[in-house]
């Protein structure tokens, strides 16, 4: 299967897109952090802060896989700890509706997993998501992440409380998944759909 997206450093031309996404309350409704609308100046500062190499974090623009390489979202790693060899998967945002229901999020996760375990040679990759997110818990399950803990009723959205689900993967688990070919996109989608079906069965009971 041909990748639908590619990855690059942030550029000045991405500011308008970031400004739009950072002010889209619906897009940000199911992220762990609280919604904070951006001024255009804040969007400029944010993009420039994401550019280049940094000791403790790394951001990539998720782009169309063509000559234009137009930004459609972003993905990042934070809290890079080279002593304890661990890193936080800070999240994925796909702001372009045309790519939100495709494989872009899986491709972005595979890319950052490879970067964390192979390029940075780290031991542990961890992250979190809200229990009410329609995609993230099932995607992390499909990718082979382990649920390590639940912070109950930790975030309030529209007068409803959601748990924060904490996930992690170790380097030996990642390499085992790679060796068995379980990061194949088609296999991931099958496990993703299966996870959704199981959650619906549990909810209905």
Task: Give the predicted meaning of each segment.
Residues 29-31, 59, 177-178:
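Short, hydrophobic secondary-structure boundary micro-motifs
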Residues 26-48:
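Conserved GNAT-fold acetyl-CoA-binding loop/helix
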Residues 12, 37-41, 56:
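Generic alpha-helical scaffold signal
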Residues 1-15, 22-24, 63, 68-205:
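Acyl-donor (CoA/ACP) binding surface of acyl/acetyltransferases
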Residues 48-61:
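A short helix-loop-beta-strand connector motif used in the catalytic cores of GNAT acetyltransferases and
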Residues 19, 44, 48, 113-114:
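Generic solvent-exposed, charged/amphipathic alpha-helical segments
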């Amino acid at each position: 299967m041909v990748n639908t997206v590619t990855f690059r450093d942030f550029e000045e031309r991405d500011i308008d897109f970031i400004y739009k996404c950072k002010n889209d309350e619906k897009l940000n409704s199911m992220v762990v952090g609280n919604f904070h609308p951006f001024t255009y100046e804040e969007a400029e500062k944010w993009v420039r802060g994401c550019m280049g190499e940094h000791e403790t974090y790394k951001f990539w623009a998720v782009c169309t896989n063509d000559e234009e390489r137009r930004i459609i979202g972003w993905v990042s790693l934070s809290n890079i700890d080279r002593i304890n060899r661990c890193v936080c998967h800070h999240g994925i945002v796909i702001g372009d509706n045309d790519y939100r229901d495709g494989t872009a999020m899986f491709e972005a996760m595979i890319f950052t997993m490879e970067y964390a375990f192979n390029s940075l040679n780290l031991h542990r990759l961890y992250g979190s998501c809200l229990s009410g997110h329609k995609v993230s818990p099932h995607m992390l399950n499909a990718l082979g992440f382990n649920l390590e803990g639940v912070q109950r009723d930790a975030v309030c959205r529209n007068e409803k409380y959601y748990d924060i689900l904490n996930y992690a993967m170790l380097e030996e688990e990642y390499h085992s998944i790679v060796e068995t070919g379980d990061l194949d996109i088609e296999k991931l989608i099958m496990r993703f759909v299966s996870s959704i079906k199981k959650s619906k069965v549990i909810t209905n009971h």
